């Protein structure tokens, strides 16, 4: 759920969800609604992905992160729907510009395609696509100082990535990467780098199951100002990443083993809030805890 940049006046918010389809298949959708008098009204879908599942794992790898940039454009991440990375890596749906599998898209706030999108007018390409070659981006944040767009995304067994997202860039999945096959441990990719494919700014090996990404801009943790905070589900950790000139120059594990971190956000009070996946606290359906981080004085 993301608020429109002018939410205070227009009361619009945006929700990504999986819209059911025929025969149990579904696709990622983004709905826009108006929140007034403690109720949602004027609910309408403004985007429905064309990201076919593989027929066996069709309920996974959806993507679904949404964010607005400074100009009011809406960005949406789409997962690869867990298509296997065989036999021809270059023909994987994440490399196909006629599907939304493994893509980032850029839209107007009403779902229209901006005329200056990088693939507008390109034959055999969906015009809303902004970037391609992703597996499953589960965190997205704009740098408030520069306007740069950053994402973290799941690798397979190993190889989670932090990427600087540029228009028309190809991030390589599954042709290049740092992960291996889940069951056999065999190599998946051609290598870690290839001409025409953008390498990650940072890699987690082993993977931590990245989820959630935000820039800290508050005053409560003054030493973190301008840094990225990234959550991990499998790794059950919160990480701090310091950037300089679009590169990661330092990293730190802030929290370890407090649960599967699904999302991390800075509150209006300047504290940091973590959404913990319910799976670690009990069976699905149990209350999902929200944790608040507050600074404490160091004890010498």
Residue ranges and their predicted role:
Residues 2-85, 139-142, 147-155, 206-251, ...:
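Acidic, Gly/Ser/Thr-rich repeat motifs that build Ca2+-stabilized beta-propeller blades
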Residues 27, 90-94, 101, 159, ...:
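A detector of repeated loop/turn-to-beta-strand junctions in beta-rich toroidal repeat architectures
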Residues 113-116, 149-152, 170-176:
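Acidic/polar loop patches that form or flank catalytic/metal-binding clefts of enzymes
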Residues 125-166:
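Repeat-solenoid scaffold signature
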Residues 165-193:
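Mobile, glycine-enriched helix-loop/loop "lid" segments at the mouths of ligand-binding/catalytic clefts
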Residues 260-263:
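Repeated scaffold domains used in trafficking and secretory/extracellular systems
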